[in-house]
Every structure is written in structure tokens, then in C-alpha cells.
Amino acid sequence: MTQAVMLQGTASDVGKSVLAAGLCRIFYQDGLRTAPFKSQNMALNSGITSDGKEMGRAQIFQAEAAGITPDVRMNPVLLKPTSDRQAQVVLMGKVATNMDAVSYHDYKPRLREQILAVYNSLAQEYDVIVLEGAGSPAEINLRDRDIVNMGMAEMAQCPVILVADIDRGGVFAAIYGTLALLHKQERDRVKGVIINKFRGDVALLYSGIEQIESLTGVPVLGVMPWLDVDLEDEDGVALQNDKYRGNAPRDITIAIVQLPHISNFTDFNALAAQPDVRIRYIRRPEALTDADLVILPGSKNTLSDLAWLRESGMADAVLQTHRQGVPVMGICGGYQMLGDTIVDEVESGLGTQPGLGLLNTITRFAQDKITTQVNATMSGELPSWLAAAAGLPVRGYEIHMGETVLQEGCCTAMTLQKNGCSVADGAVTADGLAFGTYLHGLFDSDAFTRAVVNGLRARKGLAPWETTFCYAEHKARQFDLLAEAMRQHIDIDKIYTIMQQHQEPV
């Protein structure tokens, strides 16, 4: 019979996704067929499965930790916010509709049967399912229609482990308050607590742990230290963390504009892992002063973020930096913004809007979303810092609702292989100072990344690095380091016991 365990949190960004990945890795190391599952994910970081389905990046990297191919069943509902009040609803990997929060809350009960069927189909194929909740189960205003926290635990009939973040302060209040707000039958599902992101001497916590166990009757299964491991973050709130501020000195500094609706910032994890690269996410014009490359990333609301660029002064700063000879790159929504014109008669109804004008392109938004994994080849001749990447193979994925047409003065950046056909993608200027593409995940291609970083090094008079960094091996090492740390600091045997003892008939 399939065993399962669910991680829920006292709040968002407490580390549920990373710890779930760690459990997936541990069970994989122990020889168990393991799959992650999150019934509903709200995130702008998404990826594409091999069959063209869109799902949350967190479940993709958890599947990688488990040594399996990502499957859209691991995240049947994906919500992608388009504004403060609206979100695009993606069901089983395909866009269903756009809804506001109230409409979606009313709609959720209709999803329960489909979510349960998807979960049960996974459970038939795997020995262990590691479930992840969202935010906190103590959102009492959402309890009656919950499908992602205790509502999902009830559907899966699985035990729950509560994750609490001590780094933000008030960890014992968060644990006690969360459990106090649960109904008795919900509290009974909580079989343990993990205190996460601790810095210092754990002995200082012992008296508090004893008291919280006495007050709640729930054992603390371990205290995880703040780990120096390089793993993907899912929530945009994580961009406030130190690792995204680029404080460590490196030869090359790459500035990524932190758009209000930034999506797929995981595009830059492989770039940030390069030993000679410093990544900085910026929101202020003055932060562009030392950049060797500026990147406009993906966006879930291109025209809104383009307006923010202008209102914040970032657009002028990017253009000034470009005039000073610093290359500017755009990915997906960022690529669209670099162009001359954007025509939107689909999403915002704003009609024709001017872009930044660094690429002579016209983008027209469309109703249908393109979601596909692709192989591509960089163009045979590329200028300036891109020259060494000419002709290199790359892999990535597309997630966009629009088509960009090149005008005079732009050259195709790469050729995609799609459905047996060659399709042009991207644009680059003759001087190489403006470059755009729809291809997410481009920097996961090791040879390409090293080629362009060496191109940036050459512009500064620095010698190239001859060694190519393997990002896939790096990720595998990080998963193993995470699993090792969890085995050291968490009672994994107790988690096995919890799963074995909590067997409810489905």
C-alpha cells in the first residue's frame, strides 16, 4: 500500500518545498519509488513537461530530487497571478480561464473530485507520495473550501508534519497558534513539527522545544539549520533573501530587473551557480551602475511591468546603460519589452503600446498559450559577447501567448526544432548589444552559458575560463547535501514510523 506524508507550514516561504525535495531524495536513496504532489500551486515560476504541460517549478525540482521525470499530475492546479486580484487558472497543464479570488474560491469545490482522482492515479504507481501544502493550514477564512492543506490531507488520508521558520522570529507562537486554529480532527493529523532555518547553538532551543511539545502534544522531529545549499526557490518573496542581492565579489556582474510580475526567475539559477558570476536582482536605477549584462526576465503581465519600468525610472536607466555599451538581454516577456511595438488586444485591452525600442520587433499577443520543450541551435554567426555561442546546441522551454516578428536591423538568434520543423526564434542586433529570446531555461545549457560568460569576460579584458561548469551535476550534489543534512538533523526513522502507522483506507 502506498505510504504518504504531507508537509504544511506555519506561513509561506518557511521551506516546505525544499524539505519536501529533501524527503523525496531520501526516499529515492532508500530505494523507494517516490513522487511529489501539490494539489494547488500559486506561482509565477513554472516549467513544461515533456508532453507540453505546464506545472509549478517546485514540483519539477522535487521530481528531479526523486529521480523521476516531472509529470503534470504532481501539480494538477496552477494559479499564475496576473494582477493583485486576478490569476490565470491552469488545470492539468493547460490554461482553463482567468478568475478573481472570489470566483475561484467558489469554484474550488468542483476541483476536489479531479484532484483526488489524479492523486490516486499517482499513488497506484509509487511507493511513497510526498505532499506539500500551501501557505498555512490555519487560514480559517479559507477552510471550508480548502483543497491544498488539511482539505488535501483529508482527501489523501495522510499524516501531516508542520514546518515552522525560526529565522523570521516567533517560531513557538507560530507553531502554537497554527495548531490552536485547527479543528481537532485536523490537529490529530499533525504528527510532528520541524523547526527550519535555525542559526546558532541548538541547545538554546531545548527548553522551548520541551514546552511547545508539552503545550501541544506534538513532537518536534528536528531542527534544521540554515543550509548553504543551492536549490530553487519558488516564491517571489525569496528574492528578498541575501543570496539574490549579489553581495559577493565576482569577475562578472549580471543585473536582473526584478519586475513586479517577474516569472521564471529560476531561469538564472544555472547562471548564478557559475563560479565567476554575481547575480543581482535590482529594482532601483542606481543599482545598474556596475552591470556587465542587464537582463529583463519573464513577466506574467508584460504591459503592466513595462509601465512600471517607465514609472520607476528603470527604463531610462536600462537605455542609458545600453548607450554606454552594456548589452541588454530579454527573455520571454522581457524580450517583448525590448522591441519597438507590443500589440495587446487579448490580455489588457491596451491596444498598441511602444516598447523600449532596443530591438526592431513587433509583438502581437494571442489567445493560445504556447507550452513546449524544445531543442535549438544558436545561429551560426553571432556578434560581440555572443560570438563564442554561435552554432551551439541549447535546450529550453516556451511559455508565452504571443508572436514576435523581426523587422529590418535584427537577425534571428537561434533555430528551434518543433514538430519536425525548424522555427526561427529570438532577435539580436548587429552590434550584439540587444538580444532577446522566448526560450526559458537557456542557461541550463552548460556550453552556451560558459560561452556567453567568457564573452563578457573578454569585453573586460579577462581571460576565459576553460572549464565548463555542469549544472546538472551541481543540482544532484545539492540534493544529496540536503538529504544528508536532513538525515543528520531530523528523525527520519520517526517519519517512516509516522507513515507506516498512519494507514487509512482510501
UniProtKB/Swiss-Prot annotation:
Pfam short name (any one): CbiA
GO terms for biological process, alphabetical: cobalamin biosynthetic process
Keyword terms, alphabetized: Cobalamin biosynthesis, Glutamine amidotransferase
Domain of life from the UniProt record: Bacteria
Pathway: Cofactor biosynthesis; adenosylcobalamin biosynthesis
Domain GATase cobBQ-type, chain residue ranges per copy: 251-448
GO MF annotation terms: ABC-type vitamin B12 transporter activity; catalytic activity
Catalytic residue list: 332, 440
Stored InterPro entries: Class_I_gatase-like, CobQ/CobB/MinD/ParA_Nub-bd_dom, CobQ_GATase1, CobQ_N, CobQ_synth, GATase_3, P-loop_NTPase
Its biological purpose: Catalyzes amidations at positions B, D, E, and G on adenosylcobyrinic A,C-diamide. NH(2) groups are provided by glutamine, and one molecule of ATP is hydrogenolyzed for each amidation.
Family to which the UniProt record says this protein belongs: Belongs to the CobB/CobQ family. CobQ subfamily.
NCBIfam families to which the protein is assigned, alphabetical: cobQ, PRK00784.1
PANTHER family linked to this entry: COBYRIC ACID SYNTHASE (PTHR21343:SF1), DETHIOBIOTIN SYNTHETASE (PTHR21343)
Name recorded for this polypeptide: Cobyric acid synthase
Origin species: Salmonella choleraesuis (strain SC-B67)
The encoding gene: cobQ
